[in-house]
Amino acid sequence: MVESVPMTREGYNKIKAEINRMENEEMPMIVQKIAEAREEGDLKENAEYHAQRENQGMLMAKINELRDKIARASIIDVSSLPKDEVVFGCTVTVEDVAYGDEEQFTLVGAGDEDYDSGKILVTSPFGQGLVGKKVGETAEVDVPAGKLKFKILKIEFNL
């Protein structure tokens, strides 16, 4: 079964723009560099040629990965989701039960994630551990170091 990738319309558009940029700006530059390197002669020992071919392959892999996300995209209308539990699009304030630290996360879809600003993928193990919880409940999240417990303090929507 193909797993859908939840995202907002903005996240979808951001990924489409990134694909467009890669295909229409980066790829032509790499193709040009390959052509220039090919003109230098013997391809067997042409390091520049091989490096650019490798760059081309890596860029194509990135493009294909983003195309796959777009193909499996499920655009979510955040305004239709429940407001009393942790769901896609909400900002949740949690307390680490073990240490008492408060943290805030926004659960987002592909294309919107930004871990430095607390925007985490709803499909990540951490995001999945929080989904469905209500204020006052405790979420257990599996991480490589073991299980972490977080108490849900506040759920907000920035619509």
Swiss-Prot record:
Q: What does this protein do?
A: Necessary for efficient RNA polymerase transcription elongation past template-encoded arresting sites. The arresting sites in DNA have the property of trapping a certain fraction of elongating RNA polymerases that pass through, resulting in locked ternary complexes. Cleavage of the nascent transcript by cleavage factors such as GreA or GreB allows the resumption of elongation from the new 3'terminus. GreA releases sequences of 2 to 3 nucleotides.
- A GO molecular-function descriptor: DNA binding
Gene3D superfamilies with a match to the protein in the record: Transcription elongation factor, GreA/GreB, C-terminal domain, Transcription elongation factor, GreA/GreB, N-terminal domain
The UniProt entry, under NCBIfam families, shows:
greA, PRK00226.1-2, PRK00226.1-4
**Which Gene Ontology terms describe the biological processes this protein takes part in?**
DNA-templated transcription elongation; regulation of DNA-templated transcription elongation
Q: Where does the record place a coiled coil?
A: 53-73
Say which family it is in. Answer: Belongs to the GreA/GreB family.
Q: What keywords appear on the UniProt entry?
A: Coiled coil, DNA-binding, Transcription, Transcription regulation
> What is the name of the protein in this document?
Transcription elongation factor GreA
Q: Which domain of life is it from?
A: Bacteria
Read off the InterPro entries from this record.
Answer: GreA/GreB_C_sf (IPR036953), TF_GreA/GreB_CS (IPR018151), Tscrpt_elong_fac_GreA (IPR006359), Tscrpt_elong_fac_GreA/B (IPR028624), Tscrpt_elong_fac_GreA/B_C (IPR001437), Tscrpt_elong_fac_GreA/B_fam (IPR023459), Tscrpt_elong_fac_GreA/B_N (IPR022691), Tscrpt_elong_fac_GreA/B_N_sf (IPR036805)
Originating gene: greA
